Amino acid sequence: MKKTDELRTIRIDPLITPAELARQYAITSDIMDTVIATRQNIARIMTGQDARLLVVIGPCSVHDPIAAVEYAHRLYELRVKYKDRLEIIMRTYFEKPRTVVGWKGLISDPDLNGSFRVNHGLAVARKLLLDINALGMPAATEFLDIVIGQFIADLISWGAIGARTTESQIHREMASALSCPVGFKNGTDGNIRIAIDAIRAAKVRHLFFAPNKDGQMTINHTSGNPYGHIIMRGGRAPNYHPDDINSAVKHLREFDLLEHLMIDFSHGNCLKEHLRQKNVSKSVSYQISHGSKAIFGVMIESFLEEGFQTVTNNQPLIYGKSITDACLNWKDSVLIIEQLADAVDARF
């Protein structure tokens, strides 16, 4: 029989439905309360009703659930300690966008060996989010694949759209449907206009096609997300300095958008040298302590151990060390959080 379709598809595997995964790993009432309260807190911080600073911190990507839970335990202690000045949320990224190729994250390849046991990856990710939230530690993630959100979005307090997908129409439409506040990164070249356009697009109603929780293809009609914001992540040059922030605020004002933004300490802002995140923190803390109201949040790449490691066949991995972007170690992370908390004192 002749075919004109699926000619380059090697195989098609069955995928668990979001509803079935949620039955196996069910959200509890206490976790619901954590997620709802955190989303509300972020909205209040964004709109200037809460003077605290949002801090999204954690590993570049999650590859080891055990190490991630240990990190969450440690971070929760800081969340409690600084709760009057900071709203600390753990970065739990399960999908990795790639410029060309590479490991695409815990959900796609949980065994780190190219076996692509996606159903297992989804289960590991959802269980991990339940474990982290059960501690009272809210979770943040990047939404890359537009279907994966159906499996985990109920456990996410803050979401991001990455620099490579901010300009994508379907990601803007998806953001308009998400129940959490969503940050849009500026382009990899530093262009902030695409992020501002994304905020404007996600703010209004859309319709798009996607499977529902039971796997049935549906037409989604969205109400729009009022809590979109820009994440300044640098580009060809850093963009966390006062002039960069003032320029971004001016552009936000032109479109009557919330004049608050988030600073990513990593990526282009640290010139891809992870230790420079400490320099970014020093500058941002200075700006906050000297009256900057525009900076409502920051993002930091941090793990138990400093740096990164390469996955090699038959070689054990160093516990608590990133396998994607290099991260700050725990000691430096504690110092940065303390520095940010001290800076926020000026707002009270």
UniProtKB/Swiss-Prot annotation:
Region forming the signal peptide: none
Keyword Acyltransferase: no
Pfam families attached to this UniProt entry: DAHP_synth_1
Transmembrane segments: none
Catalysis performed (reactions): D-erythrose 4-phosphate + phosphoenolpyruvate + H2O = 7-phospho-2-dehydro-3-deoxy-D-arabino-heptonate + phosphate
Keyword Transferase annotated: yes
Keyword list, A-Z: Amino-acid biosynthesis, Aromatic amino acid biosynthesis, Transferase
Pathways per UniProt: Metabolic intermediate biosynthesis; chorismate biosynthesis; chorismate from D-erythrose 4-phosphate and phosphoenolpyruvate: step 1/7
GO BP terms, alphabetized: amino acid biosynthetic process; aromatic amino acid family biosynthetic process; chorismate biosynthetic process
Any Gene Ontology CC annotation: cytoplasm
Name of the protein in question: Phospho-2-dehydro-3-deoxyheptonate aldolase, Trp-sensitive
Organism: Buchnera aphidicola subsp. Acyrthosiphon pisum (strain APS) (Acyrthosiphon pisum symbiotic bacterium)
